[in-house]
């Protein structure tokens, strides 16, 4: 009888509990995004297994980061208001068309900067 009463109280308590609010979105751009990714994803250099050989996927990620591809992607997706207007420089018609194509193609990094990311969104960007 006591077990049934306890079970009923637990069910009632969980039914009365308010639903959890949606996860907060934070606008993350540039180095703030990189810091958040390192915090959420971690990496082989920060993990306890740092003495073990680096996994192939992690090695590729480290090489990618060292070659500054991530920084290039962040700059490419930066706010167009921060870039000089390519229309003012007649010597750069090719770069202007590239910028227009880049602005059309949105990616996760761009979305994090413009509309914000949740922790779950950041986890989706982790390589492992």
UniProtKB/Swiss-Prot annotation:
Superkingdom of the organism of origin: Eukaryota
UniProtKB keywords: Cleavage on pair of basic residues, Disulfide bond, Hormone, Secreted, Signal
Compartment(s) where it occurs, according to its Swiss-Prot or TrEMBL record: Secreted
Signal sequence bounds: 1-15
GO molecular function: hormone activity; protease binding
Keyword Coiled coil: no
Feature: compositional bias, Low complexity: 81-94
Chain positions covered by the region annotation Disordered: 81-101
Listed GO CC annotations: extracellular space; perinuclear region of cytoplasm
Disulfide bonds: 29-113, 41-126, 112-117
Pfam families hit by this protein: Insulin (PF00049)
A GO BP annotation: adenylate cyclase-inhibiting G protein-coupled receptor signaling pathway
InterPro entries reported for this sequence: INSL3/INSL4, Insulin-like, Insulin-like_sf, Insulin_CS, Insulin_family
Keyword Magnesium listed: no
Principal subcellular localization: secreted
PANTHER family xrefs: INSULIN-LIKE 3 (PTHR10423:SF3)
Protein family per UniProt: Belongs to the insulin family.
Protein name: Insulin-like 3
UniProt organism field: Rattus norvegicus
């Amino acid at each position: 009888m006591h077990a049934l009463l306890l079970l009923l109280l637990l069910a009632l308590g969980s039914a009365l509990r308010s639903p959890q609010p949606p996860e907060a979105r934070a606008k993350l751009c540039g180095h703030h995004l990189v810091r958040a990714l390192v915090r959420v994803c971690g990496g082989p250099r920060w993990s306890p297994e740092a003495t073990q050989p680096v996994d192939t996927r992690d090695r590729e990620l480290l090489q990618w980061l060292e070659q500054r591809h991530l920084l290039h992607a962040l700059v490419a997706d930066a706010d167009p208001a921060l870039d000089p207007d390519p229309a003012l420089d007649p010597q750069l018609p090719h770069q202007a068309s590239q910028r227009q194509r880049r602005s059309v193609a949105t990616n996760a990094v761009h979305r994090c900067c413009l509309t914000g990311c949740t922790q779950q969104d950041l986890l989706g960007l982790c390589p492992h």
